[in-house]
Amino acid sequence: MVKIRLKRLGTKKRPYYRIVVQDVREPRNGKTIDEVGIYHPIETAEKQISFDADKVRNWLGKGAQPTDTVRRLLNKKEFTL
C-alpha cells in the first residue's frame, strides 16, 4: 500500500517536513516514490504549507492514502479529498 505522509528533515528542535509518497513498509525517512510538497511548522505565525495539487490528485487517483496529519494539512489549504 502507498501512503502520502510526512518525512522529517531539519535539525534538532527546528524540524521541517516534506510531504512524500511512500510505501508503508519503508521507514519514515526512507526511500520515497515522489515528493509532493513541504510543511514548515515553525516558519512563521502562519505555518507554511505548500504542495503540488496536481501531483496529490494524481496519487490519490492511483489509490494512495493520506495519513491523518497530511489530511488535516491538506484541509487547512482547502484541498478537497
Swiss-Prot record:
It comes from the Bacteria. GO terms for biological process: translation. Keywords: Ribonucleoprotein, Ribosomal protein. Pfam families: Ribosomal_S16 (PF00886). GO terms for molecular function: structural constituent of ribosome. Disulfide bonds: none annotated. GO terms for cellular component: cytoplasm; small ribosomal subunit. Belongs to the bacterial ribosomal protein bS16 family. HAMAP family: Ribosomal_bS16. This is Small ribosomal subunit protein bS16.
